[in-house]
């Protein structure tokens, strides 16, 4: 695993690109890699398959979402309007 305890996955960049950007990348990737809630079964078992494609490990539901998170702010607003 590349990186260190302090910077996580952004350690692969070394001293390049600046601290602020590397911290931002590490934060986004940490959120992306955690388990998310499935919109079908409600379990915390959703993982990213590819860019914008998410799949529940429990029920097998596959759906499109954001590039780094399964639910985007725009998607939340649309869902709120339609319900």
From Swiss-Prot:
Bound cofactor: record note: Binds 1 zinc ion per subunit.
The keyword Zinc belongs to this UniProt entry's keyword annotation: yes
Keyword set includes Heme: no
Alphabetic keyword roster: Metal-binding, Ribonucleoprotein, Ribosomal protein, RNA-binding, rRNA-binding, Zinc, Zinc-finger
GO cellular component: ribonucleoprotein complex; ribosome
Zn finger intervals (C4-type): 38-59
Gene Ontology BP annotations: translation
Residues noted as binding Zn(2+) in the record, renumbered to the chain: 38, 41, 56, 59
Domain of life: Archaea
Pfam families per UniProt: Ribosomal_L37ae
Signal peptide as annotated in the record: none
Molecular function as annotated in GO: large ribosomal subunit rRNA binding; structural constituent of ribosome; zinc ion binding
Subunit structure, as described in the record: Part of the 50S ribosomal subunit.
Family: Belongs to the eukaryotic ribosomal protein eL43 family. Putative zinc-binding subfamily.
Summary of the function given for this chain in its UniProt record: Binds to the 23S rRNA.
Protein name according to UniProt: Large ribosomal subunit protein eL43
Organism: Pyrococcus furiosus (strain ATCC 43587 / DSM 3638 / JCM 8422 / Vc1)
Taxonomic lineage from the root: Archaea, Methanobacteriati, Methanobacteriota, Thermococci, Thermococcales
